[in-house]
Amino acid sequence: MVREEVAGSTQTLQWKCVESRVDSKRLYYGRFILSPLRKGQADTVGIALRRALLGEIEGTCITRAKFGSVPHEYSTIAGIEESVQEILLNLKEIVLRSNLYGVRDASICVKGPRYITAQDIILPPSVEIVDTAQPIANLTEPIDFCIDLQIKRDRGYQTELRKNYQDGSYPIDAVSMPVRNVNYSIFSCGNGNEKHEILFLEIWTNGSLTPKEALYEASRNLIDLFLPFLHAEEEGTSFEENKNRFTPPLFTFQKRLTNLKKNKKGIPLNCIFIDQLELTSRTYNCLKRANIHTLLDLLSKTEEDLLRIDSFRMEDRKHIWDTLEKHLPIDLLKNKLSF
C-alpha cells in the first residue's frame, strides 16, 4: 500500500477502470480508481476489497485424478516421461472457467507417442479451458493412457489428507483463487477542509475472470456479508428475539404458481427472466446453477427442489419471497407465513 499527496479534486463518488490489459492467457491486469473518499475511508475500502478479492472469489479447478493401478503418487508409468506426482502438479496448474457448482467429472484418454496438454481434457459442457497449451505429460511410447478427473468449484486453498486410495485416485490440493494478486494505493488531494482521498486498486487474475468481473463479484460478496445486519435493523428485532425465534414450516412455490395463475392469468411467466427481479448476486447464482432462468422455472420448483441447490439458504428463500411480492402485484398475503 502506497500513500501519496497529489493535487486535484472530484465532486461525486465514482469509480473508473483506468487501465486494462491481457499479458497472457493466464494473466489479466486491471487498474481502478474510486474517489472522492473522506480521510480513512480509502484504507477501509482497500483492505476489505483486497481480502474479498483474494479469499472470497470462487474458482474452478481439478481436485482429484484417478490413474488406475498405480501403487503411489511417486510411481512412474512405463512409456510416460513424468512421474505420477509431476502429472498431478501439472493438473493442479490447469486454469478452468465455468459457472458450475458441485462436483463434475472429466477425463483424458489418448494414445502415444505424443504430448498431452490441457486441450486433451474431455470436459462437461459448462467448463472451458483458459489455456489449452498447458502441459500435462509426455507419452514416449505407443501406449493407451487414461485419467479420470474430478472438477469442483470452490474458494480459497483446499488441502486433503493423503490416503492410500485402493482405486488408484489421488487428491489434488486445489487452489480455487482466480485472483493472483491485489495491490492498492491511496492518494491525498486538496487542502484543509477540502482534503479527500483517491483509492487506486490493481488486480491481477489468472484469466478465468477479468479484473472487472472479479471486482464486481468481490463487491457483491461484501454487500451480501452485511445484509443480515440491515435486515435485522429493518425488522426491528433484537438479538434475544432472533435467538428464540421459531422458523415456521416452509411455503411451497407450487402454491405461489397456482395463486399467480389465478390472479394474473395474462402474465407470460416464461418471458420474465430472473435477471429482472433484482435478486442479490448470491441468490441469482444459486438459481442459475440450478438452470432456473425464468419466473416459470422458479415457481415450478418445490421447496425441496430449491433447498437441494448447493449453498441455497433460508435467507435466499425469504429474499425470493420479498422480491416476488415487490414486483408482482398479486394477493398472496393469505398464504404468507411470518418470518
Swiss-Prot record:
Uppermost EC category: transferase
Annotated segments matching region Alpha C-terminal domain (alpha-CTD): 266-339
Keywords recorded for this protein, A-Z: Chloroplast, DNA-directed RNA polymerase, Nucleotidyltransferase, Plastid, Transcription, Transferase
Region Alpha N-terminal domain (alpha-NTD): start-end pairs: 1-233
GO cellular component, one term: mitochondrion
InterPro entries in the record: DNA-dir_RNA_pol_insert, DNA-dir_RNA_pol_RpoA/D/Rpb3, DNA-dir_RpoA, RBP11-like, RNAP_asu_C, RNApol_insert_sf
GO MF term set: DNA binding; DNA-directed RNA polymerase activity; protein dimerization activity
EC number: 2.7.7.6
Subcellular locations according to the entry: Plastid, Chloroplast
A Pfam family reported for this protein in Swiss-Prot or TrEMBL: RNA_pol_A_CTD
GO BP annotations, alphabetical order: DNA-templated transcription
The keyword Plastid appears for this protein: yes
Family classification: Belongs to the RNA polymerase alpha chain family.
Task performed by this protein: DNA-dependent RNA polymerase catalyzes the transcription of DNA into RNA using the four ribonucleoside triphosphates as substrates.
Subunit field text: In plastids the minimal PEP RNA polymerase catalytic core is composed of four subunits: alpha, beta, beta', and beta''. When a (nuclear-encoded) sigma factor is associated with the core the holoenzyme is formed, which can initiate transcription.
Name of protein: DNA-directed RNA polymerase subunit alpha
Protein source organism: Elymus canadensis
